[in-house]
């Protein structure tokens, strides 16, 4: 499988999609729990790849896609909650299975919900063979009693998380389909033999992006049961994520002709590296559109109509949000924000981009913090040599590196900060 891992990661609540729902893709019909079992691991892995890409794209931003603020809540309170179960150790103080305002993104456990909803269809012996891990102290019976008090803000960062997560789901489903992981789909050859443009025909094995789009929609979009502005925003950003995958598809061609003359070409569409999808959506994030609607509205037919009309007028490729972002320089426990104090930044390095080189100014200076230099020793393998037969032996080299961190500005004698002290001197 293209994306796998030692965890289950998913961001929706299964009860929103009835198990009697029928799935029809490429003339292959599935009903009931089988559909979830076949695709759930790809959906989970795709969501995880989206979050990892989010962390990469915002690594040197004030908001760096922190786990505590990734919850994709919506008007129902539990529509889009992210969850992760990992066999590795969780970060200190992460509260992996806590709930409440400061709970991390992974507060709702998909595995418990999956088990509880499948119990009525399969016996427990079969379910135990699936080897879906449970958090300590939780059972199938407790799976339905889930709640959280944290509703993520409808700002551009939440919008990006929706878009990149659902792009990851569609991307992974498409890739795994082309790799033959599903019996009911394969390459998209629907246009093979047709004229694609001057001098080339469709042919080869195109990645089946239509399959990935269809399944991701059927898994995700029905969860948005609300008709308010927040639900409309989430659905719009879901689609923006899927459009990003389609917009970044690459056309690959093969020449045909005598002696490599390339008289004609056959071409097919391939998925790009997921990094390109992330780059595409990061640009959309910077140009995100704010929709001036009250995001709690939606109880009347008139307001629902106004919301629908507003979102129809916006391109599906654009990321949209309803609220302004908070000040990410500052700690905000209610929103699960830690601020930029203590964050590492970059200053020097040949391979650094302009954005990375300016990270200390952005994370520290712009937030009223100082940059502190720290020296650290790193040990790594070096001078590796191949020895017959058959081993590679390396030396352990110690290297001193310089790292930079954002810290509070030092105070001079008397406890007066430097800026305030200079103002005081002027008055005197």
Swiss-Prot record:
Location (main, coarse): secreted
PTM note: Palmitoleoylation is required for efficient binding to frizzled receptors. Depalmitoleoylation leads to Wnt signaling pathway inhibition.
InterPro entries: Wnt (IPR005817), Wnt8 (IPR013301), Wnt_C (IPR043158), Wnt_CS (IPR018161)
Alphabetically ordered keywords of this record: Developmental protein, Disulfide bond, Extracellular matrix, Glycoprotein, Lipoprotein, Secreted, Signal, Wnt signaling pathway
Biological processes annotated in GO: canonical Wnt signaling pathway; cell fate commitment; determination of dorsal identity; gastrulation; neuron differentiation; positive regulation of transcription by RNA polymerase II
Recorded GO MF terms: cytokine activity; frizzled binding
Keyword Lipoprotein: yes
GO cellular component terms listed in the entry, alphabetical order: extracellular space
Sites carrying sugar chains: 123, 176, 332
S-S bonds: 54-65, 177-185, 187-205, 253-267, 255-262, 329-367, 345-360, 364-406, 382-397, 384-394, 389-390
Tissues expressing the protein: In adults, in brain.
PROSITE patterns hit by this protein: WNT1 (PS00246)
Signal peptide bounds: 1-22
Pfam families per the UniProt record, alphabetical: wnt
Lipid-binding residues (covalent, O-palmitoleoyl serine): 259
Location in or out of the cell: Secreted, Extracellular space, Extracellular matrix
Family recorded in the similarity comment: Belongs to the Wnt family.
PANTHER family named among the record's database cross-references: PROTEIN WNT-8B (PTHR12027:SF94), WNT RELATED (PTHR12027)
Function: Ligand for members of the frizzled family of seven transmembrane receptors. Plays a role in the initiation of dorsal axis development. May activate a Nieuwkoop center-like signaling pathway.
Designated name of the protein: Protein Wnt-8b
Organism expressing this protein natively: Xenopus laevis
